[in-house]
Amino acid sequence: MEGHRKVELSEALALGPDWRHACHALLYAPDPRKLFGRIPMRFAVLMQMRFDGRLGFPGGFVDAQDSCLEDGLNRELREELGEAMSAFRVERSDYRSSHIAARPRVVAHFYAKRLTLEQLQAVEARAPQAKDHGLEVLGLVRVPLYVLRDGEGGLPAFLENSFIGAAREQLLEALQDLKLLDPGIIAKLKIPDSK
């Protein structure tokens, strides 16, 4: 979404019928484990490798038969992540933000859903059996929420990847607002320009 800008949900929902709505969700869970026995994981955060080679969040376009944004999002999550998604539902209370882009005329709505680590691991385990696995979705990845001693490995290296639309900005905003990442780490990050 070139030239995307953030808008309020009410403004996004008031746009005319020539606008398409897409919904995506950051799924996360507390993770008490430590990498190599010393680097706290804090949280597990899922993203996916998309068919176009970019990183993004699971979700997709809301269809005419979907009664609301969240129905469309939950349908897309089941298609992309499989039946483990039936154990919970992303609701309006999980809504975070909306971004619009004039070309194409798309509104991207962003949600964040907290799961248990067991629920998140079930999603990861069953995703390869999902309808869209190997097609729209090439695989799931966890976001490394740490910085290695060299100052480049972990999250800084992850952010160098190519992200779709506003996904990088949505990720960083959610990490900060949901307190999934130590604030000191965010302050030290060199955020690459959107690719």
Curated annotation (Swiss-Prot):
Binding site for Mn(2+) 3: E76, E80
Motif (Nudix box): 61-82
Protein name: U8 snoRNA-decapping enzyme
Binding note for cofactor: Binds 3 or 4 divalent metal cations. Acts specifically on U8 snoRNA with magnesium as cofactor. Has broad substrate specificity with bound manganese or cobalt (in vitro).
UniProt-annotated location(s): Nucleus; Nucleus, Nucleolus; Nucleus, Nucleoplasm; Cytoplasm
Taxonomic classification: Eukaryota, Metazoa, Chordata, Craniata, Vertebrata
Annotated residues for binding of Mn(2+) 1: G59, E80
Residues covered by the Nudix hydrolase domain: 18-173
Subunit structure: Homodimer.
Gene: Nudt16
Reactions performed catalytically: a 5'-end (N(7)-methyl 5'-triphosphoguanosine)-ribonucleoside in mRNA + H2O = N(7)-methyl-GDP + a 5'-end phospho-ribonucleoside in mRNA + 2 H(+); IDP + H2O = IMP + phosphate + H(+); dIDP + H2O = dIMP + phosphate + H(+); a 5'-end NAD(+)-phospho-ribonucleoside in mRNA + H2O = a 5'-end phospho-ribonucleoside in mRNA + NAD(+) + H(+)
EC number: 3.6.1.62, 3.6.1.64
CDD domains cross-referenced by the UniProt entry: NUDIX_U8_SnoRNA_DE_Nudt16
GO molecular function, one term: cobalt ion binding
Function: RNA-binding and decapping enzyme that catalyzes the cleavage of the cap structure of snoRNAs and mRNAs in a metal-dependent manner. Part of the U8 snoRNP complex that is required for the accumulation of mature 5.8S and 28S rRNA. Has diphosphatase activity and removes m7G and/or m227G caps from U8 snoRNA and leaves a 5'monophosphate on the RNA. Also catalyzes the cleavage of the cap structure on mRNAs. Does not hydrolyze cap analog structures like 7-methylguanosine nucleoside triphosphate (m7GpppG). Also hydrolysis m7G- and m227G U3-capped RNAs but with less efficiencies.
